[in-house]
Amino acid sequence: MFDYQAPAELLKDRIILVTGANRGIGAALAKGCAALGASVILQGRDAAALDQVCQEILASGGQAETLVLDLERADAAAYAAVAERLRQRHGRLDGLVHNAGLLGPRVLLEETPAAALAQVLQVNVQAGFALTQALLPLLRAAGEASLIFTSSSVGRKGRGGWGAYSVSKFATEGLMQVWAEELAEDGIRVNSVNPGGTRTAMRAAAYPEEDPARVPAAEAILPVYLYLLGPASRGTTGQALNAQ
């Protein structure tokens, strides 16, 4: 596991948006950030699931709000509306974690329908690009914001049978590297995290015969995310990190 011990008030008063925060890694990270003092914005398309995570955070004394947005169907107007809402409510954004993702069909590229590739690229790449672009003024306003893209081992070394998902994660790594160079002078650090095998619904779909008890829970892989969101990672940008 990534070796980092987060101080008690690491993210005090920071505004952090986590996509795909209704379950899995996103939900665990949102709760972890709130426990360390952050005001967390939980994005997802399942309003009921988001509200449940939000209520758990509020019940434990944390600060959170929900942002219902379907990344598969969102257009420029929707992203602009999100940016305006956050500008009015917070005026800045200290952290943006692109966690939401779509697995798509685990088949050979030869067998991958073009529509399936387009759908996976929309959620895993285009949405991250469009949301980042819309929120750049708020990230700049924070002074030293952190932007995190979720990658995968199959986005760093191609593997047959991972089809559209692997292609999308290679694109994610490229997006991270370009943003890192372009935003360096703005003090915005941009990195990617490969969570590794984690006990999530996506993992279960990819490995249906695997015993989930043999892979780490989402809470176990949070240290790398917390490190990147906190001040200890100042100067760390353009890096492809592993959670475990």
Regions found by a protein language model. Give the residues of each.
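C-terminal helical subdomain
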Residues: E185-I188, S192, T200, E209-Q244
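Alpha-helical segment proximal to the catalytic Tyr-Lys
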Residues: P137, A180-E182
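Rossmann-fold cofactor-recognition segment
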Residues: A59-D75
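Active-site helix of classical SDR
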Residues: T132, S168
